[in-house]
Amino acid sequence: MRFGWLEVAALTAASVANAQVFDNSHGNNQELAFSPPFYPSPWADGQGEWADAHRRAVEIVSQMTLAEKVNLTTGTGWEMDRCVGQTGSVPRLGINWGLCGQDSPLGIRFSDLNSAFPAGTNVAATWDKTLAYLRGKAMGEEFNDKGVDILLGPAAGPLGKYPDGGRIWEGFSPDPALTGVLFAETIKGIQDAGVIATAKHYILNEQEHFRQVGEAQGYGYNITETISSNVDDKTMHELYLWPFADAVRAGVGAVMCSYNQINNSYGCQNSQTLNKLLKAELGFQGFVMSDWSAHHSGVGAALAGLDMSMPGDISFDDGLSFWGTNLTVSVLNGTVPAWRVDDMAVRIMTAYYKVGRDRLRIPPNFSSWTRDEYGWEHSAVSEGAWTKVNDFVNVQRSHSQIIREIGAASTVLLKNTGALPLTGKEVKVGVLGEDAGSNPWGANGCPDRGCDNGTLAMAWGSGTANFPYLVTPEQAIQREVISNGGNVFAVTDNGALSQMADVASQSSVSLVFVNADSGEGFISVDGNEGDRKNLTLWKNGEAVIDTVVSHCNNTIVVIHSVGPVLIDRWYDNPNVTAIIWAGLPGQESGNSLVDVLYGRVNPSAKTPFTWGKTRESYGAPLLTEPNNGNGAPQDDFNEGVFIDYRHFDKRNETPIYEFGHGLSYTTFGYSHLRVQALNSSSSAYVPTSGETKPAPTYGEIGSAADYLYPEGLKRITKFIYPWLNSTDLEDSSDDPNYGWQDSEYIPEGARDGSPQPLLKAGGAPGGNPTLYQDLVRVSATITNTGNVAGYEVPQLYVSLGGPNEPRVVLRKFDRIFLAPGEQKVWTTTLNRRDLANWDVEAQDWVITKYPKKVHVGSSSRKLPLRAPLPRVY
């Protein structure tokens, strides 16, 4: 296997150890170009709710050989087993097949007889913790029933720095608090169903352009390294790390490191983000897995905190691996300490036991690589047994109900001048626009949904699933209108503008459907290389709206999109009587929409992002051209914490629709704000102190002779194994640079297993436990002042004070039901983290002495209640 594994590892480690500052001469923030080293990689200790699972993990790992431990850490290769990623097995100890990891955050990818759930952005639009949990639980049940151990989701990266970022729809919202809560609830739901959840993509994975070298070169960009997202420490903590802290506190079992570099160190070998922030500061007890082919070194990644390499090979189907045999070699020759591989295995097995995989596990009953019933056991090389690979297990249960409910609960009513709800008495209804109809190639006609044909209910990429069916808006509206005795006329060709004009001129109400799509960078649709080229509507959408509006004075516009689109040309046209954003609602799309259109569901959704007048309104453009020669493109996050509504507030720019905005068929009033300091004597902040125990080791390493390929083993071509060809470690590694001195490439302290000092901001999963002590109670009275029952989403924002802070930041929210005339007192609390800022010098959270205020209302700019916060330190 001649591919310079140790050479790559050595160079990578040396660059970190020597604190090399990469060229970033174009930027204003030179200090952002460097990621400080942090070693050694913290070892798991089973804190809190992890204790029992950790104990069981230690027990089984103590019985494993080195090769068995390595087998758990390394995927067997792309298309080598049933799942998109699958580790080796440990049959001697009852792990008879490798751990199965499978996409995606909205349903099972590459499968059948599964559900297609609403996207993460729709969950954010509900602002509903219970619905987030129930969706996670339903997805977890389906993955479990298919034999999946690790669900590769949910996502909080990208967070949403760029409104045109290709994968923002997979996550939740550009607000860290909204994302963090729904991220955590989704994780709880998945893991309560017995499946390991994966918090991804960690971290600063905010655009698709330049995320992978080969992909970028395929689009004609001459780069040799992936993009570097360069951020300061305060912004990292207060914005991008925030939801991952919530995920760790919720007990997430796995974290997926990202393709991009962070401050010029690759995400899956960045000791600052993996060792320090995730494992030492946030106290993460689970395992870190690489994104697929985001693993760039052997020793460097192992020492920097990576625990699992996926899918195991360096490039898809090349049969080469940074780990596998090479990880075995590196432990035997002392390059990687035994305790580090022990910790990898313990972390993996701890997550396994924590969610109950030992009780629930069944073999994968589907193949990711074919829909045929029979196929090769090892698809990539057509080897192994020709066997039954698909059992066609229907795992949908009754999940269509929660999908339909979330679809309706996430339908944002942006504008309504009395057009909605429809009465059902409309005689002639026009349904206009391609986005209302079916994909002529079928709902799953485009691989990984990589096209924009028909209605948009899911965007594209690995974050997708096959639809079991797709109820289009046209189908659902037609069924509704016919049942009411009316007439419905549909034109779903966006080029048929004259026909649309004819229908619109005859209709009592015209429903216009438009969309905007995006996705993962390995697919380009109409020149959109994952990221959107702009924020305009797709498929001639503006012309469709203009045509219909000019012929019908009761036009309702429905937008299916991955994020914000530009609507400034037409949103205030008086003939546009209502605007709906329906996002990416999944398989029940049409039914969910009709429930809202006809008033069976009173809309309560709130937009999870800001609707600006222009792309420039959002700040810095997405990086679409290399800016560092053929080196790593440099994306400096110079805006700091000021993204989305925080950016608009800083610029004092009025958006078209602000973050948190959403109308209802009723009205709500806010009154009687009360703010009360809680007993602070028992809640003083206590920085964590002390040190860890020494790094534990489990079992004996043995010698090279113990890890030769087993006699009689029929090797599968390109399959990644942990064993050695020879007792000569240099020969087994087959690396021309074998034998380098450790001092040339091992970072200082990287192999130190002695007790290590605890970080002040650490101490428990999620960070210092006293960060989560409640300091202030806030209550307000919410009244339904209208004539229709409905849900309202009260939102609490805090002004943290200080000259360089956002005007307000969201901290708490809820979704409460109120009958007409009903009042409820909504009560919530603010904890220390809610009121603190990250102090870069102190490396800890600090409540500053600047005066602070609390604001309560229905959106980020409709905050009728406000009061000063009591001083709490």
UniProtKB/Swiss-Prot annotation:
PANTHER family xrefs: BETA-GLUCOSIDASE, BETA-GLUCOSIDASE A-RELATED
Similarity comment text for this entry: Belongs to the glycosyl hydrolase 3 family.
Reaction it catalyzes: Hydrolysis of terminal, non-reducing beta-D-glucosyl residues with release of beta-D-glucose
GO biological process: cellulose catabolic process; glucan catabolic process
Keywords in alphabetical order: Carbohydrate metabolism, Cellulose degradation, Glycoprotein, Glycosidase, Hydrolase, Polysaccharide degradation, Secreted, Signal
Gene3D superfamilies recorded: Glycoside hydrolase family 3 C-terminal domain, Glycoside hydrolase, family 3, N-terminal domain, Immunoglobulins
Residues listed as glycosylation sites in the UniProt record: 71, 222, 263, 326, 333, 365, 453, 534, 553, 575, 679, 725
Gene: bglA
Function: Beta-glucosidases are one of a number of cellulolytic enzymes involved in the degradation of cellulosic biomass. Catalyzes the last step releasing glucose from the inhibitory cellobiose.
Main location group: secreted
Hydrolase keyword on record: yes
Pathway entry: Glycan metabolism; cellulose degradation
PROSITE patterns hit by this protein: GLYCOSYL_HYDROL_F3
SUPFAM superfamilies per record: (Trans)glycosidases, Beta-D-glucan exohydrolase, C-terminal domain
Residues at the catalytic site: 291
Group of enzyme by EC: hydrolase
Protein name, entry field: Probable beta-glucosidase A
Keyword Signal in record: yes
Subcellular location: Secreted
Record's signal peptide: 1-19
